[in-house]
UniProtKB/Swiss-Prot annotation:
Residues 429-472, 491-513, 650-687 are annotated as: Disordered. GO terms for cellular component: cytoplasm. Residues 670-681 have a biased composition (Basic and acidic residues). It is an enzyme of class 3 (hydrolase). This is Putative lipase YDR444W. Keywords: Cytoplasm, Hydrolase, Lipid degradation, Lipid metabolism. The active site is at S284 (charge relay system). Its main location: cytoplasm. One of its GO terms (biological process) is lipid catabolic process. Residues 436-463 have a biased composition (Low complexity). Belongs to the putative lipase ROG1 family. Present with 2070 molecules/cell in log phase SD medium. Its EC number is 3.1.-.-.
Length: 687
């Protein structure tokens, strides 16, 4: 990595039992904290000092008492650890039979022992230097009080790393660089004299910035740091760590804290650099939380997002975020505890319950008049004056799990409306063209990626994208898009209501805009309890999956740009009183419909649906590098299409254009801007 906090004194221990101790560390970590080490050995230099080795031994021990092992709900009192040779890269096949060592939960009084090899996988270029990166991450998820202690040793024999009491002396050729959480999340820009693009990340419930969002941060920096100066976005990634352990305080409170943090961070950075652009990335509850932060800023500092004098909004990205709440998707036995405060104010917010006598700071502008029904925090978020800010983002993107996410199901993560009809017809075309070349992703006709590439058309002349050739896993994934012999209409009514209109269509008939009478199998709904338990029980990627990208079957199955004119007419508006009395969920559905339409009636959204293995809610952000690697496809897509070289080239071109006062452009103009210049890998390969 290009930055380091400390270059530790290199040392050598001569041990009476035989062997040489090269590293002996002892540290403590709280919730949301980690240490990253880069251990390097110059083989030629240490050979001159009598150390001729082809491998070394690493030992990490959780020094906490074994009595803490059963206390999982208040902990867990464990560490996640991985050891990556210098040449390991998720994008490339890792050669040979060497394993990538990691442990998902190093429990109290347990030891993690690894034999690290000085070979081509760890060799730095053509030099005699060999290097490894070691991440040691606290797994604490709830309480902020404990500090977990670990010991970390590297030596030339197993005995010396197990127990060593010898004499140290300095040695050349061995180095250990160390980064703590604060330093990793406070890296400076590559070009201090150039304008800075600030990326703000926001975590979800029982989560944290320092550890859980680290993989996405790493990937954004790995993508942008090597870019040529002419197009380099000069990224700085930051995240507010003050909400750790406070998930129940409510969306308003959490968002206000993030909003204040953003203002303070920008003001602080502007003393050294010039913050020119800003992007937001939120996971799970982080989506509504960052939305509240944007609202707070738009009210407290109306000029903050000014296109000329302020910071330009670029990306607004959410991954598995409950925009319209979860009350319609959670079973009754879980909804009641949320109403009663099982997750504090946050649970009530997500269950669309109003809590009086709470702060209204940053919710309303003094000169605004709001509808009487706008009392739910999730409904207030996209309203004026924040709406103008959300509309001004260059890109607004939603990532949602199609299946296996009972925490934030597809319906709320995708803002209610999807083009089910297009997905169904694409599947039919895929079956007819089994022998045609296929792409690695599904790309819809309206995807920002599809410009400049041809794609097949259906019988109505509407362009559709392609889905990859079928495999057993993909068949299970997409079985819900296939025509079925028998299915009851009542089971798919909510999908009919969520079906978007075709572009330039005047149809307002629900049945007509859905599947033209064809039978439809909706996606299987995940069980909320099982989804929560999957954090503990979900399968972990094997070594073949970790080392070989070709075997990974998790994929993007839908990627489309949704325009406001595609929204169907509101279903729950002006309904007869009798229906309001008959249907128990009428009120909830009406509120959720209002929220979804408020977000989409004036804004274009890119909706990306991914199919990844359980536990998909954590996998979608790769919460832990190897445990949650199934979500690699989502993170890769997000980074490539929002921070990739082509996108950065466009931003660089925009920055070089004359900066005149912006006129009042239409939403259609903003939508066209969103489409410009993005080409997906799937579209490039389409035939």
């Amino acid at each position: 990595m290009p930055y380091k906090i400390n270059r530790m004194k290199n040392s050598l221990e001569i041990n009476e039992t035989g062997g040489t101790l090269l590293v002996d560390e002892r540290k403590r970590l709280r919730i949301g904290e980690l240490y990253r080490y880069k251990f390097s050995v110059n083989k030629d230099v240490i050979k001159e000092q009598g150390l001729d080795v082809s491998h070394l031994f690493l030992r990490i021990k959780n020094e906490e008492s074994a009595l803490l092992r059963p206390l999982y709900l208040t902990g867990p009192y464990s560490f996640y650890i991985d050891v990556r040779p210098h040449n390991y890269n998720e994008n490339r096949k890792f050669p040979g039979k060497e394993i990538i060592p990691f442990v998902e939960n190093l429990k109290p009084d347990e030891r993690f022992k690894v034999k690290i090899l000085l070979n081509e996988n760890s060799r730095v270029g053509d030099t005699s230097l060999y290097s490894w990166t070691i991440d040691i991450i606290s797994q604490l998820a709830v309480t902020t009080i404990p500090k977990l202690e670990f010991s970390f040793r590297i030596g030339t024999t197993r005995k010396v790393v197990k127990k060593s009491n010898g004499l140290f002396k300095s040695i050349e050729g061995v180095s250990l660089e160390m980064w703590d959480t604060e330093t990793l999340w406070d890296l400076p820009p590559k070009f201090p004299e150039k304008p800075v693009h600030l990326v703000i990340m926001t975590h979800g419930i029982f989560s944290n910035i320092g550890c859980d969002m680290l993989y996405m941060k790493d990937k954004i920096e790995e993508m942008t740091f090597p870019m040529d100066e002419s197009i380099n976005p000069n990224i700085i990634v930051r995240g507010f760590m003050g909400n750790v352990g406070k998930s129940g305080h409510g969306i308003h409170c959490l968002g206000v804290r993030v909003g204040k943090y953003v203002l303070e961070t920008v003001d602080k950075l502007n003393k050294k650099y010039k913050v020119d652009r800003i992007s937001f990335i939120g996971h799970s509850l982080g989506g509504p939380t960052q939305s509240m932060a944007v609202r707070y800023i738009s009210i407290k500092r109306p000029d903050f997002f000014d296109a000329v004098k302020g910071v330009k909004p670029v990306n607004f990205i959410t991954l598995a975020s409950p925009f319209i709440g979860v009350i319609g998707d959670f079973p009754f036995y879980l909804s009641v505890p949320l109403d009663m405060g099982a997750l504090g104010l946050t649970g009530r917010d997500l269950n669309l319950k109003y809590t009086p006598l709470t702060s209204k700071d940053g919710l309303y502008a003094d000169d605004e008049v709001y509808p009487e029904h706008s009392k739910y925090i999730l409904e207030i978020l996209p309203q004026a004056p924040a709406k103008k800010v959300f509309e001004s983002f260059k890109r607004r993107t939603i990532y949602a799990n199609v299946m296996d996410d009972g925490i934030v199901p597809l319906r709320t993560a995708a803002l209610l409306y999807l083009d089910w009809r297009s997905i169904h017809k694409v599947q039919k075309i895929r079956k007819k063209n089994k022998n045609s070349p296929t792409s690695s992703e599904f790309v819809s006709s309206d995807s920002p990626e599809s410009s400049g590439a041809s794609s097949p058309s259906n019988e109505n002349g509407n362009n559709v994208g392609e889905i990859p050739a079928e495999s057993p896993n993909k068949k299970a994934t997409l079985q819900w898009t296939l025509p079925q012999a028998v299915i009851h209409g009542s089971k798919i009514n909510k999908y009919k209501r969520g079906q978007t209109n075709e572009a330039n269509s005047d149809s307002d008939n629900e049945q007509g805009v859905f599947l033209d009478g064809q039978k439809f199998e909706p996606p299987k709904e995940a069980n909320t309890v099982l989804s929560a338990l999957s954090v503990l029980t979900a399968a972990i990627p094997d070594q073949e999956y970790i080392k070989n990208p070709a075997v990974r079957k998790d994929e993007v199955i839908h990627d489309k740009l949704y325009h406001p004119e595609e929204l169907p007419p509101p279903h729950y508006e002006n309904r007869p009183i009798v229906k309001k009395l008959i249907y128990p969920n009428e009120s909830v559905n009406r509120i959720q419909e209002r929220i979804a339409r408020e977000w989409q009636e004036t804004m274009t959204w890119r909706k990306v649906l991914v199919q990844i293995q359980p536990d998909s809610h954590n996998n979608i952000v790769v919460r832990r590098r190897f445990v949650n690697l199934y979500g690699y496809v989502a993170v890769e897509h997000m980074v490539e299409h929002h921070f990739g070289s082509k996108v950065c080239s466009e931003l660089a071109e925009d920055a070089n254009e004359p900066k005149d006062e912006p006129n009042q452009s239409s939403q259609a103009d903003r939508s066209n801007e969103y489409n410009e210049g993005e080409i997906s890998k799937g579209a490039e390969n389409a035939t």
